Curated annotation (Swiss-Prot):
The lineage of its organism: Bacteria, Bacillati, Cyanobacteriota, Cyanophyceae, Nostocales. It comes from the Bacteria. Mn(2+) 1 binds at D33, E57. Substrate binds at E100, G101, T102, Y131, R176, D177, R178, D198, G199, D200. One of its GO terms (molecular function) is sedoheptulose-bisphosphatase activity. SUPFAM superfamilies: Carbohydrate phosphatase (SSF56655). Pathway: Carbohydrate biosynthesis; Calvin cycle. It comes from Nostoc sp. (strain PCC 7120 / SAG 25.82 / UTEX 2576). CDD domains: FBPase_glpX (cd01516). InterPro entries: FBPase_class-2/SBPase. This is D-fructose 1,6-bisphosphatase class 2/sedoheptulose 1,7-bisphosphatase. Mn(2+) 2 binds at D97, E100, E225. Homotetramer. Transmembrane segments: none annotated.
Length: 345
C-alpha cells in the first residue's frame, strides 16, 4: 500500500493545504475548510482505488462531500468497469480532516494541517462525532503511562521513562474551561503547560518525535481526530489512548447528543457495547497497513506552512507508514507555470 499510495496521499493533503492557505488570515474559517474539502476530494478521485470515507466531514445529510460512507477514487466512478481491473483493485478505508484547525487558518495562527489516514478495508475505527479523552506520549513511555492514572502519576512515570525532571516536561492541553482542573494539576506537579486553541492532531504526533519539546498530550478533544492521531502514533511507536465521552455534562457543549442516554443508544446502534472502553492506537488503527499523511497549512511544531511565490507554492508534508515504520518529511515546490517577464522602469 505504501508503494502504491504513499506519494498519492501526499499530493492529496498538499492540494488541500494549498487551497486552504489562500484563505489564511481572512477570518473565513468555513471557506478555508470548504476549499480544502473540495481540493482533497478532487485529488482523491484521481487515485486508482476504491476508497470509503469512515471519518469525514459529517453525516451524508449534513456534508455535501467527504461525508461518512462516501466512496472516492477512480474505481468508484460510473465507468469503473472499464477503468479498473478487479484483480488489481485496492479497497481502503479513509479518515480525513482536510483543514485541522479551521480557526487557526482563519486567524493566521500556527499549527493547522490537512491530514488523513488510510488502511485496508476495516482497518480504521469508525469513531462517532463524540468527544474523546486522550493521552499521547513518546515511544519510551508506551504502555507505561495510562489514561486511567492521574496526570500527576503519569508525569512521574514520564519523567522516569525520559530521564528528565518533571519541570522539564511540556504537556499540551487544549484551552477549554473543562480543562481547568487538569491544567492546575499538571502545574502543581511541576510540569509546564502549552495551551492550544485548536488542532490537537499535531500535538499528539509531536509526542512521537524527539526534539519537538512536546512530551505529552492530555485532555478531551474530538474523537475523529483521535483516530487520525492514533494512526500516526501507531506507526511511530508512540503511546496513544482514547476513551469516548458520551455524557454531555463532561464537556458542556453541543458536539455530542442532547442526552447521555441518547448517546449510549447511538453507540449501541454502532456496535459499541462497552462505552467506557479505553482504546489504544492498535485498536483505533488496527489495519495491517496504516498510512498517515499531513501537510502544513500554517507553520507549526512539525511542518512549515504553505509559502506562496509568484507562480507557485512550497509545501512541507509528512507521511508515516506502519508497514515500513518510517516517517518521511517531503518538501515540495509546486510550479504553476513559467514566471511572467517583468519590465523594470
Amino acid at each position: 500500500m505504501e508503494n502504491t499510495l504513499g506519494l498519492e496521499i501526499i499530493e492529496v493533503v498538499e492540494q488541500a493545504a494549498i487551497a486552504s492557505a489562500k484563505w489564511m488570515g481572512k477570518g473565513e474559517k468555513n471557506t478555508a475548510d470548504q476549499v480544502a474539502v473540495e481540493a482533497m476530494r478532487e485529488r482523491m478521485n484521481k487515485i486508482y482505488m476504491r476508497g470509503r470515507i469512515v471519518i469525514g466531514e459529517g453525516e451524508r445529510d449534513d456534508a455535501p462531500m467527504l461525508y461518512i460512507g462516501e466512496e472516492v477514487g477512480i474505481c468508484t466512478q460510473p465507468n469503473a468497469d472499464q477503468l479498473c481491473n478487479p484483480d488489481e483493485l485496492v479497497e481502503i478505508d479513509i479518515a480525513v480532516d482536510p483543514c485541522e484547525g479551521t480557526n487557526l487558518v482563519a486567524y493566521g495562527q500556527p499549527g493547522s494541517m490537512a491530514v488523513l489516514a488510510i488502511s485496508e478495508k476495516g482497518g480504521l475505527f469508525a469513531a462517532p462525532d463524540f468527544y474523546m479523552k486522550k493521552l499521547a506520549a513518546p515511544p519510551a513511555a508506551k504502555g507505561k503511562v495510562d489514561i486511567n492514572k492521574s496526570a500527576t502519576e503519569n508525569l512521574k512515570i514520564l519523567s522516569e521513562c525520559l530521564d528528565r525532571s518533571i519541570d522539564e516536561l511540556v504537556v499540551v492541553v487544549m484551552k477549554r474551561d473543562r480543562h481547568q482542573g487538569l491544567i492546575k494539576e499538571i502545574r502543581d506537579a511541576g510540569a509546564r503547560v502549552q495551551l492550544i486553541s485548536d488542532g490537537d492532531v499535531g500535538a499528539a504526533i509531536s509526542c512521537g518525535f524527539a526534539g519537538t519539546n512536546v512530551h505529552a498530550l492530555m485532555g478531551i478533544g474530538a474523537a475523529p481526530e483521535g483516530v487520525i492521531s492514533a494512526a500516526a502514533m501507531r506507526a511511530l511507536g508512540g503511546h496513544f489512548q482514547g476513551q469516548l465521552i458520551y455524557d454531555p455534562e463532561v464537556v458542556k457543549t453541543g458536539l455530542i447528543g442532547e442526552s447521555k442516554q441518547a448517546n449510549l443508544d447511538r453507540l449501541s446502534s454502532m456496535g459499541i457495547n462497552d462505552p467506557d472502553k479505553v482504546y489504544d492506537a492498535h485498536e483505533l488503527a488496527s489495519g495491517e497497513n496504516v498510512l498517515f499523511a499531513g501537510c502544513g497549512i500554517t507553520s507549526g511544531n512539525l511542518m512549515q506552512g504553505v509559502r506562496f511565490f509568484h507562480g507557485g507554492a512550497r509545501t512541507q508534508s509528512l507521511v508515516i507508514s506502519s508497514q515500513s515504520q518510517t516517517a518521511r518529511f517531503v518538501d515540495t515546490i509546486h510550479m504553476a507555470g513559467q514566471p511572467k517577464t517583468v519590465q523594470l522602469h
